[in-house]
Amino acid sequence: MLRRTSFNFTGRAMISRGSPEWSHRLDLKKGKKTTMMHKLGTSKPNNALQYAQMTLHDLTEWCLAYSPWPLTFGLACCAVEMMHAYASRYDLDRFGIVPRPTPRQAEIIIVSGTVTNKMAPILRNIYVQMVNPKWVISMGSCANGGGYYHFSYAVLRGCERAIPVDFWIPGCPPSAESLVFCLHTLQKKIRWHEIQKYSVRD
C-alpha cells in the first residue's frame, strides 16, 4: 500500500511503501539518501548468485529510473502546461522521459484535467492496461479534487476515486516546472527503492 509523499518546509520527504523493515529519508536539496532502518539480513552478497541478482536488480532500477515512459492523459487546460514541459524550453525527452501513445508501453500516467463520471471507467481501463510497476500523477486542481467544477453532478471529485494516485501536483493550472520537479522526484523514488517492494495495485 502506497503512502503519500509528505513534504515539509525544509525540502525533505519521507517515502515509504508501507513496509516496516525498510524506510528511506530523502534530502531533496542535497540529493542524498539516508537509510533509517536497514533491511533484515546482510547487505553484502554471500555468493556469486546473490551478486548476480543484486547487479541485475541495480540495472533494472537504473533502467526504470532513467527511462520512465509516461502516458499523457490530457483532459483540460492543464494538458497545455504538460505539453509545455515537453517543448523546447524544458525538453523532458533529454531526461529519458518520452511520452508513449499506448498504455501497454507506459509506466506513468499523467492525469491532467477534469475527470467526469463518464471518463472514470475509461481511465480505470487504461490504468489496468499499463505495465507494472506503474505510477499515477494527478496534475492540477481539477484532477486532484474537482477544482472549479467540484460541485457539478457530472464531475468525479478527484481521480483517486477511480485509480490510486502516487503524486498530486497542485495549481490551476500548475506550471511546467512543477511537473518537471515531480518527475525528477519520481525518478529518485524509483532509484532508491527495491523493485519487489512495488505492489500490483489493480
UniProtKB/Swiss-Prot annotation:
Superkingdom of origin: Eukaryota
A Gene Ontology BP annotation from the UniProt entry: electron transport coupled proton transport
Record keywords: 4Fe-4S, Electron transport, Iron, Iron-sulfur, Metal-binding, Mitochondrion, NAD, Oxidoreductase, Respiratory chain, Transit peptide, Translocase, Transport, Ubiquinone
Cofactor-binding details, from the entry: Binds 1 [4Fe-4S] cluster.
Intrachain disulfide bonds: none
Annotated transit peptide: 1-56
GO CC annotations, alphabetized: mitochondrion; respiratory chain complex I
Pfam families, sorted: Oxidored_q6
Protein localization: Mitochondrion
Residue numbers binding [4Fe-4S] cluster: 77-78, 142, 172
Record-listed E.C. numbers: 7.1.1.2
Cofactor entry: [4Fe-4S] cluster
PROSITE patterns attached to this UniProt entry: COMPLEX1_20K (PS01150)
Chief location of this protein within or outside the cell: mitochondrion
Molecular function GO labels: 4 iron, 4 sulfur cluster binding; metal ion binding; NADH dehydrogenase (ubiquinone) activity; quinone binding
Annotated catalysed reactions: a ubiquinone + NADH + 5 H(+)(in) = a ubiquinol + NAD(+) + 4 H(+)(out)
Protein family membership: Belongs to the complex I 20 kDa subunit family.
Annotated function: Core subunit of the mitochondrial membrane respiratory chain NADH dehydrogenase (Complex I) that is believed to belong to the minimal assembly required for catalysis. Complex I functions in the transfer of electrons from NADH to the respiratory chain. The immediate electron acceptor for the enzyme is believed to be ubiquinone.
Oligomeric form and interacting partners: Complex I is composed of 45 different subunits This is a component of the iron-sulfur (IP) fragment of the enzyme.
PANTHER family: NADH DEHYDROGENASE, NADH DEHYDROGENASE [UBIQUINONE] IRON-SULFUR PROTEIN 7, MITOCHONDRIAL
Name of this chain's protein: NADH dehydrogenase [ubiquinone] iron-sulfur protein 7, mitochondrial
Record organism: Trypanosoma brucei brucei
